A protein has these predicted regions:
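Beta-strand repeat architectures
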Residues: 1-39, 46-60, 68-136, 143-157, ...
Length: 192
């Protein structure tokens, strides 16, 4: 069992953490993956603390997690295949259920995020890398001052009344919206 009461777990090689080794977030904890490495974990993450993904490597979460705090991406890639990989759905709107400082969220199967699960940008850019043939649907509000970049050939559907203020860039795949607000707050004057 691994318990975070603060501090950092740093991984220096690619490997799979035994799924029987539960992770408890008594307080905030950081998982730092070194460059070019991948940590895969399919066990349960529980507790009320926040979990931060740091380091330029990749963290793969595949468990039905019950943690109630925020998930933060500071750098590198967080890879998921289900909303449950991010923990319990908030009972009411949480603007920071998923927080980007920078880094990438990679989606390997179609995922729908509940409208109570808000996403906030605190850094310069948030990358959404959606694999081919899959869709990430964000029903909550995306807020903050950072930009959004769409990567991967899959589809990103933005259904919320989003308030983020920087640019939206499509490098690959599709972004689907049903209203202007899907692309965040409109500029105060024309821009190009």
């Amino acid at each position: 069992h691994l318990t975070f009461n603060g501090g950092v777990l740093r991984t220096t090689a690619s490997f799979t953490l035994n799924s029987n080794r539960g992770i408890s977030l008594l307080s905030n904890g950081t998982i730092l993956t070194d460059p070019g490495t991948t940590l895969t974990y399919g066990g349960i993450i529980a507790g009320s603390g926040n979990l931060l993904k740091d380091g330029t490597g990749t963290l793969v979460l595949s468990g039905n997690n019950t943690n109630t705090g925020s998930i933060g991406i500071n750098s590198g890639t967080l890879r998921i295949s289900s909303e449950n990989n991010l923990g319990s759905v908030p009972g009411s709107f949480d603007s920071d259920k998923l927080m980007f400082n920078d880094g990438t969220l990679n989606i390997t199967s179609s995922v729908t995020l509940n409208s109570n699960s808000g996403i906030s940008y605190t850094g310069t850019n948030a990358n959404f890398d959606i694999n081919n043939g899959t869709t990430l649907t964000i029903n909550g509000i995306v807020s903050g001052g950072g930009a959004m970049t769409k990567l991967g050939t899959g589809n990103l559907t933005l259904s919320g009344v989003n308030t983020y203020t920087a640019t939206t860039t499509i490098n690959a795949g599709t972004i689907s919206i049903s209203a202007d607000s899907g692309l965040g707050a409109a500029p105060g004057s024309p821009s190009a």
